[in-house]
Amino acid sequence: MIIKPKTRGFICTTTHPVGCEANVLEQINTTKAKGPITNGPKKVLVIGSSSGYGLSSRIAAAFGSGAATLGVFFEKPGTEKKPGTAGWYNSAAFDKFAKADGLYSKSINGDAFSHEAKQKAIDLIKADLGQIDMVVYSLASPVRKLPDSGELIRSSLKPIGETYTATAVDTNKDLIIETSVEPASEQEIQDTVTVMGGEDWELWLAALSDAGVLADGCKTVAYSYIGTELTWPIYWHGALGKAKMDLDRAAKALDEKLSTTGGSANVAVLKSVVTQASSAIPVMPLYIAMVFKKMREEGLHEGCMEQINRMFAERLYREDGQAPQVDDANRLRLDDWELREEIQQHCRDLWPSVTTENLSELTDYREYKDEFLKLFGFGVEGVDYDADVNPEVNFDVEQF
């Protein structure tokens, strides 16, 4: 079929398999160009490996460190009549390129919150890898099915205490609007912590540890975003922030356990990037369009892949073997460039003056839109979008 982009709200409802493959290859080439990480991980589990920072982590491990990787995700394959999700095509492309380079690559498609996913991963690790030396936790899901009761819990992207009103961009109509978000109830805050907090990360590590598949010295990392006062009401000081604070709690508990065998657990605080997850958060698209323009001008811009390559090479797996630099909460900070005072001051000054008319001139909004479509495989250089493509792409994946 010939596939064109169709957007609804903050998602694109179509995806392009060839475009997604080209995106993955671009990230692989970026990683290979950095050169190998001398003392990187060799057997890696990535939970949430099909897009964004999780996909970049899998690429960094495999193509930067020559690691065998096992990826866990929840994606839909394409059918004769309908394309699959971008994450399905990303994972298929990763698998193809990893195998072409002689690297071990297997994937599990199913609910990562379930007991079954954990057991499937353990069985594969025992059969194929023995033990793993790195676990990346990168789930971004709006809903979690509790593994014991089967109850569905939903997260909320809401402020706490009072209604949040701010200038934002309507990405469907390309208009500057004023948006208001009602505050979260106590229940909504609790539910957001249940879905997006650290509990499932702990459950994964407990299951892996009990099964004896964690090697001595195993490192685990989960991803967070803090931002600044520009986004704090909706993010760090909102319901989502409470969940990310719970990730800090989990990291501390996990670090205490893993350090007894020479391992570690850290939250890595990353910069804002264009992902399906960030596009759903009010004000983030406008903030990203502003901050990207300034960071590009300063030569500081990074996408997911550049961020994760820096985390591997300059934080977790330093050439000198030294422990990574952390903040006072033991977090790895990769948002250091974004948080530079001159970058943030620029955004603070610019925010009130952005209008629908000057949006594309004052910010990188057009680039934001391009990058958003690219997540789904569209607008990728060198791809013929008038060509007939097969939406059914299969690869080495266990489904349940």
Swiss-Prot record:
Organism encoding this protein: Shewanella woodyi (strain ATCC 51908 / MS32)
Residues engaged in binding NAD(+): 48-53, 74-75, 111-112, 139-140, 244, 273-275
UniProt name for this protein: Enoyl-[acyl-carrier-protein] reductase [NADH]
Protein function: Involved in the final reduction of the elongation cycle of fatty acid synthesis (FAS II). Catalyzes the reduction of a carbon-carbon double bond in an enoyl moiety that is covalently linked to an acyl carrier protein (ACP).
Membrane spanning stretches: none
Family annotation (PANTHER family): ENOYL-[ACYL-CARRIER-PROTEIN] REDUCTASE [NADH] (PTHR37480:SF1)
Family note: Belongs to the TER reductase family.
EC number assigned by the record: 1.3.1.9
Site entry (Plays an important role in discriminating NADH against NADPH), positions: 75
